[in-house]
Design a protein with these regions (language model features):
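Intrinsically disordered, Lys/Arg-rich N-terminal extensions and targeting peptides
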Residues: 1-33
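Acidic-enriched and Gly/Ser
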Residues: 53, 76-86
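Short, charge-patterned binding micro-sites
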Residues: 62-78
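Beta-rich strand-turn-strand
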Residues: 86-112
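A structural signal for short hydrophobic beta-strand segments in well-ordered beta-sheet cores
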Residues: 50-54, 111
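Short, surface-exposed beta-strand-loop junctions and turns on beta-sheet-rich folds
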Residues: 38, 46, 53, 66-69
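Structural motif
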Residues: 33, 55-56
């Protein structure tokens, strides 16, 4: 269950409810770089075209645009680089089996 009373919602994918039939929801962590964290906290995230790709039994978030952090020095992150999702092994196996057997897609709906 997602607790939203103490969390700040960073980004919402509003088109996901209209373009897809949402079957289940999962909560996952995401591996971010330092400048990505600061940019995400300021709300510079786009989830509209994002999806999850399965590579070597790991879940990778693709096409999520996190804008470069303005106050960063010359080294900044790639805005649309793949980002690893962090879940328990049993949750990863469940999602992989569902996507392969029923030809489903994993879509991010909210980032907080």
């Amino acid at each position: 269950m997602i607790k939203t009373h103490n969390t700040k919602i960073i980004a919402v994918n509003r088109k996901a409810k209209f373009n897809y039939q949402l079957m289940e929801t999962f909560e996952a962590g995401i591996s971010l770089l330092g400048t990505e964290i600061k940019s995400a906290r300021s709300g510079n995230v786009q989830l509209r075209d994002a999806f999850v790709n399965i590579i070597k039994n790991e879940l990778w978030l693709q096409n999520t645009h996190i804008s470069p952090y303005i106050m960063a020095h010359s080294e900044n992150h790639n805005p649309i680089r793949p980002r690893k999702l962090l879940l328990h092994k049993r949750e990863i196996n469940k999602l992989i089996s569902k996507t392969r057997e029923a030809n489903m897609t994993i879509i991010p709906t909210k980032m907080y």
